[in-house]
Amino acid sequence: VLDIDWKSENYQKLYRQRKSLISELKKPLPETIDFCKILSTKGEDEIYYLTDLTQPEKEKIIKWLSNYGVKYSKDELVSILMNVYPDLAYYLSSYRYRNEFLNTYFENYKYQKITNRILPSFDKVVEEQAIKMDFVTILKPRTAYLDQLDTQNAQVFFVDAMGVEYLSFIQQKCSEYGLSANISCARCELPSLTVFNKEFVDVLKDKGCLISDIKDLDDIKHH
């Protein structure tokens, strides 16, 4: 597949065949490592040859985004990633917050995060919001939604460190699995440390809910 130009007519067929072969291999790591070494000769075009089926390739995709991502618009990156790394495309996709400031803020935030850049214009917004804190007036506090929740036969998952940036990913995965999603966005209490934001645990426990406390994402972010 590396001998074929990714723009050629037969490339996608060969690309899908390679993905199928990788899926069948019990231990594809050695082959994948060699593949990634050779792939480096492709430069900016290497993204079109990668898949999300092995760890070395995923890491290669992240490195490519850091090296070349800012040369592409958000929509262009979503289009590329939808083929090579769908879950990452889901993360980068838009989520509508019913507020233009939040829409723009989180689209820019995710784009910069995925391309490993901080743009001066965004840095200015962050500095301004540290004082203005518009999100306080835009979003209701989390406690405002607790009494509205239907907790009968409910299972609660408390995923530490999972902010609203992941809502597009969650929404897309729900659609993929045929699940319905009713999403309400709220703000946490400041400071945003977990120890100051667990009041809902006792409230929901008192209502008889089973609560799963998931810290995997928080551990990844901090370590």
Regions found by a protein language model. Name each.
Residues 1-154, 161-223:
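…; additionally, a secondary subgroup of soluble metalloenzymes is captured
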